[in-house]
A protein has these predicted regions:
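Short pre-active-site segment immediately N-terminal to the catalytic Zn-binding motif
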Residues: 282-287, 338-358
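Short beta-alpha connecting loops at secondary-structure transitions
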Residues: 342-346, 373-384, 410-420, 438-439, ...
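Gly/Pro-rich turn-and-neighbor structural signature
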Residues: 266-330
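Post-HExxH zinc-binding segment in Zn-dependent metallohydrolases
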Residues: 245-246, 370, 381-409, 417-419, ...
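A well-structured
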Residues: 1-281, 293, 568-569
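C-terminal, non-catalytic "cap/extension" segments appended to globular domains
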Residues: 118, 230, 321, 357, ...
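Catalytic Zn2+-binding segment of zinc metalloproteases
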Residues: 362-376, 397
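Active-site scaffold of zinc-dependent metalloenzymes
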Residues: 323-350, 367-368
Length: 570
């Protein structure tokens, strides 16, 4: 069994990709039977697997050290030729949609209708005339990513990457928290010209692409690019209303109480990361202890999760140390040719480190479990909202094992985790609606964008005050929310998934084994059913129905009160 560091990387030249793809497209067009179409599909899937593996390996090695000249060049290569590869696949998609054998393939179950539906959405997301714009977009995104990865924050004599600075945002000492946010704001302000300029470029590039493709603005194209098969802007509008009506008042009430316990009035942005006056629970140990606890947890959870964690640890499929020039976020990717998931994170000694072995491992488990699904190349593990349900739900299924990570602080962790999960819904809704407004108004100035952010904060998080925090008080919190620059419209997915994950938590409190079995069934199907159908099958409520979050809000608040009462007895 090879370790991830030993996996061989070979560039797949675009010329070779193009030759193979062209031959496959011709084979589909000239097919005399359904079987010939299937043979071409097999070849195309093999080509896609090789391409995605090479691209993912090069990106992973770039992200663990963004200053590595070789992998930086490889990443830039894929940024440049990726749109050309997409264009070849677009021609393949057109050929597949046009084949006279489509009905026969669907009826025989050789290719499920959802594959063809996903092809139709892909057609709406891509066109040869926007290739140059896609290359330009990739280049600007790379500039932003590198700037953020290399940005250092000078705090008390140390130069820290942002993940390490944010550790101080959870300090029980308010002066330290305030200072950390001041350093964050001042450092971002020093880069404000680039932050505004890069985003402005991205907005205009994306708007130009949308208009070239005949869309009114980038909102429509953005949804197609996300491959959404069961909801659009109207459904998200209803979801936003559900959050405003049922979640915002509960979160505001709970957070006000937390502020009172912390003895702070008003509740400032730099108070928001702290829940307990004595300091929030942190794992009882470093990296080794966390991984030992994770192994024990997954072995107890089920035989399958036990095999999964052994595989991940034996292949050294984690890179979790925070260091300079390492990409600042966390992600799970996979290398399909090797059926190998991989997790990158930046441990900083907070509870977030444990979330890596629950949340990101939830993604990895889905990759591991669906690796051999018959339609995994076309449909993956599902839409992003489905994928995030896998990860966010795993965080909650890990609750019975939190004593392995937090010892006697397990109860405090559960309270904090649930409060954070609920509090996230208004924030994620802001991130999504901000993007909608920005792309509907592409000619807004940087000041108008910042004003829109401030207005959304006042609407969805009225309990937080930004006043007096350098730069961030201007409405710039979004400038280090990297999704907004890098992957537009990939954020509401987290919110939709959170509503499903909260329901899995509430169900697991009634019958853990039954809820976990429903979760594994949900996860195992990958993308072979759309999100709303998977929810229905798991007996969970769709977040798009009017009033869908009322019960989630009430039951989650009741559970928080119950957890709080237990903590008060300690």
């Amino acid at each position: 069994m090879k370790k991830v560091s030993e996996l061989e990387y070979t560039r797949l030249p675009i010329e070779d990709f193009g030759k193979e793809a062209t031959a496959i497209i011709e084979q589909v067009k000239n097919a005399a039977s359904a079987q010939e179409v299937l043979a071409a599909r097999d070849k195309c899937n093999d080509l896609i697997i090789r391409w995605e593996t090479a691209e993912a390996l090069s990106y992973m090695r770039y992200s663990i050290n963004t200053a590595d000249a070789f992998y930086l060049a490889e990443k830039e290569y894929y940024d440049e030729v990726g749109p050309q590869a997409q264009n070849y696949l677009l021609e393949y998609t057109k050929a597949m949609l046009a084949t006279p054998f489509r009905k026969e393939l669907e009826e025989q179950g050789e290719i499920i209708p959802l594959v063809f539906r996903s092809f139709e959405v892909e057609l709406k997301a891509m066109s040869p005339e926007i290739i140059e714009d896609m290359i330009a977009e990739n280049q600007v995104v790379s500039q932003y990513s590198q700037m953020m990865a290399g940005m250092e924050f000078e705090f008390r004599g140390e130069k820290l990457p942002r993940p390490m600075l944010m550790k101080y945002a959870k300090s029980p000492d308010r002066a330290i928290r305030k200072e950390a946010y001041e350093v964050l704001g001042k450092t971002l302000k020093a880069h404000s010209e680039q932050l505004d300029g890069l985003f402005d470029q991205l907005v205009h590039i994306r708007d130009r692409m949308a208009k070239k493709m005949g869309y009114r603005n980038f909102v429509e194209l953005g949804y197609y690019r996300m491959g959404r098969l069961c909801y659009g802007p109207e459904e998200v509008k209803q979801f936003r209303e559900n959050v405003r009506r049922d979640i915002v008042p509960v979160v505001a009430r709970l957070r006000k109480e937390i502020g009172e316990k912390l003895g702070v009035e008003p509740l400032m942005l730099y108070d928001y990361d702290l829940i307990f006056p004595q300091g929030d629970p942190a794992p009882k140990g470093g990296k080794e202890e966390i991984f030992a606890a994770a192994r024990a947890m997954y072995h107890d959870m089920s035989e399958e999760t036990g095999k999964f964690i052994d595989f991940m640890l034996e292949t050294e499929a984690f890179d979790v140390d925070s260091r300079k020039n390492k990409w600042g976020g966390g992600y799970c990717t996979h290398f399909p040719a090797y059926h190998q998931p991989f997790i990158l994170a930046n441990f900083n000694g907070t509870a977030g480190d444990v979330d890596v072995v629950t949340h990101e491992a939830g993604h990895a488990f889905a990759d591991y479990k669906t690796a051999k699904n018959p339609f995994v190349v076309e449909l993956g593990v599902g839409g992003m909202e489905t994928a995030e349900t896998h990860s966010m739900s795993m965080e909650f299924f890990a609750w019975p094992y939190m004593d392995k990570f937090f010892g006697e602080d397990a109860g405090r962790y559960e309270f904090m985790h649930l409060l954070d999960a609920l509090s996230f819904l208004p924030y994620g809704t802001i991130v999504d609606d901000f993007q909608r407004q920005v792309y509907e108004n592409p000619d807004w100035t940087p000041e108008e964008r910042k004003a829109a952010w401030r207005k959304l904060e006042a609407e969805f998080r009225p309990h937080i005050t930004f006043d007096g925090i350098p730069y961030l008080e201007e409405g710039t919190r979004w400038q280090y929310q990297m999704h907004i620059y890098e992957t537009p419209f990939y954020y509401i997915d987290y919110c939709l998934a959170q509503t499903a994950a909260l329901q899995f938590l509430l169900e697991s409190r009634k019958d853990y084994a039954d809820a976990f079995a429903r979760y594994v069934r949900f996860l195992s199907q990958g993308g072979e059913k759309v999100f709303t159908d998977l929810l229905e099958e798991a007996d969970l409520r769709s977040p798009f129905q009017a009033g869908a979050l009322q019960a989630v809000a009430q039951e989650s608040e009741a559970l928080l009160r119950q957890l709080e009462a237990k903590l008060d007895q300690l």
